[in-house]
């Protein structure tokens, strides 16, 4: 990894931490980052000439794998016509039609340029629509780096053990109410004390940024009922789960319909994109037809729209249950191998995602996720990477499996797990 290390040293002189998103620095796994030259299918190729089987997928967008021919073709054709217009184009409508057709809760949708923009905009809309200010979020859930969401957040905030962040005034997070994930009783108590002031509950319907944590039976339905009772909006942050758990996302998978949904990652096919949508009466409060302002220079970017259209067209044909069955078998075998080594381990999995927690206890919320042994994960990560298996450089993230992963890829993954020593 000599060239990767040299590039990292060069980057650190110019870019804070040498990276443009904190987890990529690999600090929590005591490693230098791999600098990537290209991706193809299920593989990444580093500047050092190494091939890796990729189980990160750019943190989730690449359910089709790297450089999918249909997506690449759409991108090339779009960029040949121009990279950005700052004016409406037909592909904005075509992608909106695909999203509305797929996602149960969405009657209208607004395109933005990132998942963070989507969640920030959805919260502003919820506050504008309800005339209330308070928000309930869950410990360990990550909704981007908007100020209101950086209280007890997951993802890089959890990876780097940052309790919050300087630069966010106390007055901003004062309206953010926290509850443990899967703890409906705590949510009930918050509504009993603040119900008239709560604009929304935002939740990852399957948590993916404290590692993968499934919703307990009745949890999402309970949130739906509480929001209905108190007149608050239920926001599903489906930036990770949208088009991954099923074509209609987590809300289709679990059969629970939120008021607003945020999307990102997969809907751009690897291009920078986000979206938020919901019931027509709520979405019509957004400017210019309503009084809740939101805008973006690159929102509806034609290249990103083309990539999204091509991606969703391919995913509409995908066999999601078959992929889930394959991933469940893979995760079960990984868990069995590690347990046979005498290692404390719990492997949470759902659809095409899984997380290896080095703890014997069930992981059902942020507190139990934090009990996992980070030192064991570091050893595991380093040895897996040395064997050509590219995992997230954090125990608080998910392994992502794509439709491009083959049985040979799975066999190589399992062989590498067998070779790990602790």
Swiss-Prot record:
It is found in: Cytoplasm. SUPFAM superfamilies: PLP-dependent transferases. The keyword Isomerase applies. It comes from Oleidesulfovibrio alaskensis (strain ATCC BAA-1058 / DSM 17464 / G20). Its EC number is 5.4.3.8. The modification N6-(pyridoxal phosphate)lysine is found at residue 265. Signal peptide: none annotated. GO terms for cellular component: cytoplasm. This is Glutamate-1-semialdehyde 2,1-aminomutase. GO terms for molecular function: glutamate-1-semialdehyde 2,1-aminomutase activity; pyridoxal phosphate binding; transaminase activity.
């Amino acid at each position: 990894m000599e060239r990767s290390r040299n590039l990292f040293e060069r980057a650190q002189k110019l870019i804070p931490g040498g990276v443009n998103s904190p987890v990529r620095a690999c600090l929590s796994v005591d490693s230098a980052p791999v600098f990537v030259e290209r991706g193809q299918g299920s593989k990444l190729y580093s500047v050092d000439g190494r091939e890796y089987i990729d189980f990160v997928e750019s943190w989730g967008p690449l359910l089709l794998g790297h450089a999918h021919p249909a997506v690449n073709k759409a991108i090339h054709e779009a960029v040949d016509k121009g990279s950005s217009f700052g004016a409406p184009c037909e592909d904005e409508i075509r992608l909106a039609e695909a999203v509305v057709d797929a996602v149960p809760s969405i009657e209208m949708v607004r395109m933005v340029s990132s998942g963070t923009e989507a969640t920030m905009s959805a919260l502003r809309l919820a506050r504008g629509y309800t005339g209330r200010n308070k928000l309930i979020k869950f410990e360990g859930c990550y909704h981007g780096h908007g100020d209101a969401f950086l209280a007890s957040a997951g993802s890089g905030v959890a990876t780097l053990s940052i309790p919050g962040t300087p630069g966010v005034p106390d007055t901003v997070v004062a309206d953010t109410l926290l509850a443990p994930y899967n703890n409906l009783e705590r949510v009930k108590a918050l509504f009993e004390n603040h119900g008239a002031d709560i604009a929304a509950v935002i939740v990852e319907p399957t948590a993916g940024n404290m590692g993968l944590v499934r919703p307990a039976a009745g949890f999402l339905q309970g949130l739906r009922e509480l929001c209905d009772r108190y007149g608050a909006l239920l926001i599903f942050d489906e930036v990770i789960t949208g088009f991954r758990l099923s074509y209609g996302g987590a809300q289709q998978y679990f059969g629970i319909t939120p008021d607003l949904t945020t999307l990102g990652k997969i809907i751009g096919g690897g291009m920078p994109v986000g979206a938020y949508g919901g019931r027509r009466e709520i979405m019509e409060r957004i400017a210019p037809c309503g009084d809740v302002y939101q805008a973006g220079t690159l929102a509806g970017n034609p290249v990103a729209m083309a990539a999204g259209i091509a991606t969703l067209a391919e995913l509409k044909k995908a066999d999601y249950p078959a992929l889930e069955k394959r991933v469940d078998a893979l995760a079960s075998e990984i868990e069995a191998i590690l347990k046979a080594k005498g290692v404390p381990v719990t492997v949470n999995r759902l659809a095409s995602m899984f997380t290896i927690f080095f703890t014997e206890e069930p992981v059902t919320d942020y507190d139990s996720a934090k009990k996992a042994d980070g030192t064991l994960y570091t050893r595991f990560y380093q040895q897996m990477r040395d064997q050509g298996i590219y995992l997230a450089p954090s125990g608080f993230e998910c392994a992502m499996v794509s439709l491009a992963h083959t049985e040979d890829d799975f066999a190589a993954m399992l062989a590498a797990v067998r070779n790990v020593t602790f």
